[in-house]
Amino acid sequence: MDRLVNNTLSAWILIEMLHPGELEDIKSYLNKDLFLLNEQQKAVHDFESFYPIWEDERFQLNQLSSSKGEIQFQLYRHCFKFGEIEQYIRSIFNDEEIYNPDNRNCYGYTFMIDNEGYVLMDTLHVPMLMSALKYLKNDKNILIEETYQDHFEKFKHKCEEIIGNNKLTKEKLHKLDQLYSKYFALFETNYQGFFKQAIGIKYVTPNEQSNELNSFYISDMEFAKKDPNKTLTRYIHGVNDKDKKVIDENKEYIERYLKPDFYPDGRWPSLVEHRLSLMQQVAVNQITHDQMKISSVNGPPGTGKTTLLKDIFAHNIVERAKTFAELNKPSQAFKFQKIHETDQFPTAFLNDVHTHYKMVVASSNNGVVENISKDLPKISEVIRRDISSNFPEYEEAYQNVAKELNIFSEIAEKLIGEKAWGLFSGVFGRKANIDSVMTQVLTSCESKTLNKILIDAYNSVDINKEWKDAKQSFQKTLSKVKVLKKEINQGIKHFADFRKSEEQFIKYQQELVELNDENKNNNIDSLKQRKKNLENQITNVDTQINDLKEYIQLTKNKNSFKDKLKQFLGSNSSGAKDIDYEQRHADLLRKKIQFNDDKIRIDTEITMAVNEINERERRINRIEQNLMQLRKNQQGYLNFIKEHPDVVVPDIEFWRSGNEAYNMRQEKVLWTSDELQFERGLLFLKAIVLHKLILIGNAKSIQSGLYDFQRRYEYLDAAPEKVENAWNVIHLVFPVISTTFASFRSMYQTMPKDFIDYLYIDEAGQAIPQAAVGAIQRAQHLVAVGDPVQIEPVVTIDRNLIDSVRKAFNVPERLVSIESSVQTLSDGANIYGYWKGEEGEKQWIGVPLWVHRRCLNPMFTISNKIAYEQKMVLPEYIKSNELEGKVGRVSWIDVKGKANPKQFVKEQGIVVVEELKKDWVKAMKSGKQEPNVFIITPFSRVKSEIITFAKKELKPLVNQNINVKKWLHESIGTVHTFQGK
């Protein structure tokens, strides 16, 4: 087996085991309004000396409280401080001494008794840590879960024998304590003033769900260790740095992924003018086209992570609709076969080709996943009658198709609590959520269920005719999308030709200038002038030569007698003179020859210069012809942009450098048109119509699948195929399902690896890496969205202890550390992303989103500088609003006080509620029912205390018709509560 995967999972399992069982806050109190004596009571008491506490009059409820709930008592046995065992744990790994011990109050085991003293055996719990501590020293790789389950079952069984059907007594409790020490580690506290045995007082209402006290994730990690799938293996191994590709501002990749062929055929039907930002669209196109095992997107709240997920959801819906469009009639989507030959009836199985589009949204934050599932079906997502649009005809077309889906609107409205356009996503996860969904789709007696709606619709329509019409409509729109893409692809070809010809055009233009300059700067005239001067000089020399010849001849005739006499007498003067004339003659001849040579050379130069000019003229003519041809070639592109002014092209202006150009670029997307945007949104709605008709056309098969889902726990062992098919049916009814990681295993238990086709993890930066293992093991593809610089995962174990585990299993720090999250691991497994930070402290993040649509200055500028390297972009419309004075406010209120209980500072709460009262008064004076304000707190205790205080203060101030309690719970919460708002 892969050593890194095995060691990492082992380290994560051990870390999960190290979570202790914690006592409730020992300083907290129960409200006096609960009790008959009208006195507040401490929530936790010392219980070292046993007595029948259920008979204590202090804990007797008044009549109103009794009608709504009951008192129960939770016993915490063998209590200790976590720091006491932390040193022991670290000694196992040969780690150093603890200097700041963890002072959390922990217990060995716990159980509850009712208000009559009877033990509620189902509440018996032993933290797995107590089993691990008993055996860990001898074997760090021991399968603790198997050992724990075996010992816990034996412990519980013997506890039942000891208790029987009797009330708890001192003797029975002593026997339970002795039995506990046989199977689990026993620690007694050495701290003074701390309860060795404690009891908690709890007011329990019927709807309260007991929490699973052991880690939710260990079983799935043990399951994954046996046969990890490719997605989980990639998640743990990541990608080598040398293989990572920076996509931010990468011209090659951005232009590639924004070609029409990379755009999904379908998109979420938002307003046509509301296009995605540059990196949003790059992310959508890359994820849907490449179908990689792991993709990740990074951006703070407000950058459109959920928005891009909607487009990905729409893509998968359209792709499944294409498989439906291959059917002649909807009933062909199912096949009937017996699981066993002895079965009385066959099971209706959804054909395999239609099952490859199961989508799950998961998070560690329940509010996040519920928000997504409840937002998607909202009527405003598709039908926007009160919102103005640049394209009212497109909006009307969307609404007309959406009307065909209102058969499911009533059920969707019951599920999300407000007006809905149709059935699309389901809030699953906790049993209560699933039961609520199943009530609406199958079992409700108070309203018409989905099951009944489908059967009635099947009996009242000609389903095959409707199918034929809907299929034709879908295929027509799909063809239109392909035509528009082809049209834009032709534009891309024209643009490529234009860009290429533009480069050549510039080269030709430069060459023309150079050729013309060379022609202008030729030296023919100077050569001709020099030739003329030479010819004049030659003529002059010829004249001199002729004159000299004539003079010599004349002199020769006159002086012939004298010369002979002088010669006779021995005189030489005449001979000397003749020699001088001959010398002059020779010099003139040489000069003439030189002049003639120069003239010949100049003639040659003139000929060459003329030839060069003629050649340049011919080249100029050819270039001018080429330029004319290039202009013709460019006309195709010029015609395209004239006919498609709404299509953004990656021209020189688009890729211009500078901050202003960068901001402009980040807001735009390439190679799409308003019409293509519209048709893609329309295709999604028509795909949903096909899904609707598949449900109606297979009403009985859907009913069968829903009943199988209702009874899925009965079939886990006897007929697992039924359970798998039932989940396929559920994913057909609800294309998108949401759940928390904590509920994933209980939901999809026994489902094989790779069962989920697409897993989307929202706010992945808030989740510890091991939380997602069970989900990833069951997923073929993972898309993680989040922001590592926002809220980090909540880790309750000391950093040094985590480091000890990491070193013991020899795994990289990126996998096991206090800073690791699902987001950081997903980013590390994504080949596309961005190196963030300075040299030496660089961090690899996934595809970055830079356009922030939910922030105003000055907060935008502050955050951008602190956390985002000033890469974030404020949209143009927000900047325009700033010019009109629409900006945010930032201020601080300095309040001093002490925290009690826990993190709540009463003095701060008073000031906050006073400010809140002012907001309410202002809102009511302006005619509004309630103010538009959020109070965000760092801790849950602060939230609950402020809600309690505000409820009391607002009661006399606000009209009784207004549900103040509901408003407070929606408007006051922790940072997690308001993620995405």
Language model region names:
Residues 792, 966-981:
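Conserved RecA-like P-loop NTPase helicase motor core
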Residues 1-204, 636, 644-668, 672-686:
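A helicase ATPase "motif cassette" and its flanking acidic/Ser/Thr-rich regulatory loops
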Residues 398-404, 408, 412, 416, ...:
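Long, amphipathic, heptad-repeat alpha-helical coiled-coil stalk/linker regions
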Residues 864-954:
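Conserved helicase/translocase motor-coupling segment
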Residues 741-746, 940, 971-978:
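Conserved helicase motor
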